Amino acid sequence: MTAAYPPTVARRTRARKGEGAALRAEILAATERLLLETGSAEAVSIRAVAERVGVTPPSIYRHFADKNDLIFEVCAGHFAALDEFLARASEGVEDPVDRLRAMGLAYMRFGLANPEPYRILFMTRADDTPEEYKAVVLRDNAAFDQVRRCAQECIDAGRFRPGFTDAYRLAIGFWARVHGLTSLLVAKPQFPWPDDREAFVDEYASICLAGVVRDE
């Protein structure tokens, strides 16, 4: 017997009162899975999400304005988790340089502990998500802003070498360094990394600030 193509999708009955939140969560979860499978926001469509959940496309629009809004919400939850992770790691660290180093280490640990969310945030094509890399969007990112503010504290405390006076530029450079290693560790787990990976990551957090911090 030949299967019908395209395959039919079992449709849900109309949601009862109180089920809307559960459906919204299912839609977000399906979108996240599609992002991971395709590696591109462009490849994710409202129709594909609807088929994955088992609803009609109009059901998606009752919860999200459009595809961009849907993908934004998927990313927003993970960005909030990253923001909280960095805040906890740097809490109580008085020296601003040590705090910045702690944030870099926390960023890498977050990526290694949560490789799939990390891929969604930083390693998929996401031109229509919060990661458009426009300055106005980037500055609104809470996790990035923590790094920028800490870099400014380092400047104000005279902890950086002369010439390093732009906290925004420094924060981008620091982010680029920690992201570089994190993305490699996530994308290339079979590479012969040092056996003591935790110590290696810890060392790298200090290397990221080499040449910037003033000698004491």
Q: What are these language model-derived features?
A:
Residues 1-22, 33, 187, 216:
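N-terminal intrinsically disordered/low-complexity leader segments
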Residues 150, 207-215:
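C-terminal alpha-helix
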Residues 24, 46, 68, 72, ...:
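Short, structured helix-loop boundary elements
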Residues 29, 97-116, 168, 172, ...:
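Amphipathic alpha-helical segments that line or abut small-molecule/effector binding pockets
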